[in-house]
């Protein structure tokens, strides 16, 4: 005998997302958000792929004031969540993952500081010039703008990622702790 669901949501009550799936989905969504800022709010000429996509479309800023710093938040939190989803390393590794991605973002932000940018751009290996996208590396440092708010947003992104990771573990939906 076939049973009939009592409500539209009843068939889905057994659906449980694993922590790695939650982290992966949120990470991908945050990556899309950060990418969306670059594609929708920034000039195409600023993009590393500008030479590959010959467009001259100009749109009004969709993300407004937040558009300047939102990628720092989105990318740090996305990469931390994606890394935590792939490694599933336990409570001891998760803060290291978040701090690691924060450190990468802060290093690139500091590299745009006027006192450091020229030195770093000159230190880029010569072979980068022959690799699409990598050939833009010196311009990233020379044309970029150092912004303390980017560091603040990146810090908020790392903290947010850590809270998401810790929360999925605290709710008992994570496998046993595989500490270092």
Residue ranges and their predicted role:
Residues 1-180:
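Bulky hydrophobic segments
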């Amino acid at each position: 005998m076939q049973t009939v669901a009592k409500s539209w949501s009843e068939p889905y009550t057994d659906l449980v997302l694993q922590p790695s799936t939650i982290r992966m989905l949120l990470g991908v969504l945050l990556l899309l958000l950060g990418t969306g800022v670059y594609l929708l709010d920034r000039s195409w000429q600023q993009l590393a792929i500008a030479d590959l996509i010959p467009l001259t479309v100009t749109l009004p800023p969709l993300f407004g004031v937040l558009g300047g710093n939102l990628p720092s938040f989105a990318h740090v939190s996305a990469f931390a969540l994606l890394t935590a989803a792939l490694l599933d390393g336990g409570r001891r590794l998760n803060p290291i993952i978040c701090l690691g991605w924060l450190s990468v973002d802060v290093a690139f932000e500091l590299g745009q500081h006027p006192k450091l940018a020229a030195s770093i751009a000159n230190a880029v290996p010569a072979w980068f010039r022959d690799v699409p996208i990598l050939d833009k590396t010196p311009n990233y440092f020379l044309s970029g703008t150092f912004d303390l708010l980017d560091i603040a947003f990146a810090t908020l992104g790392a903290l947010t990622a850590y809270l998401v990771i810790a929360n999925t573990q605290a709710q008992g939906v994570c496998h046993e702790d595989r500490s270092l």
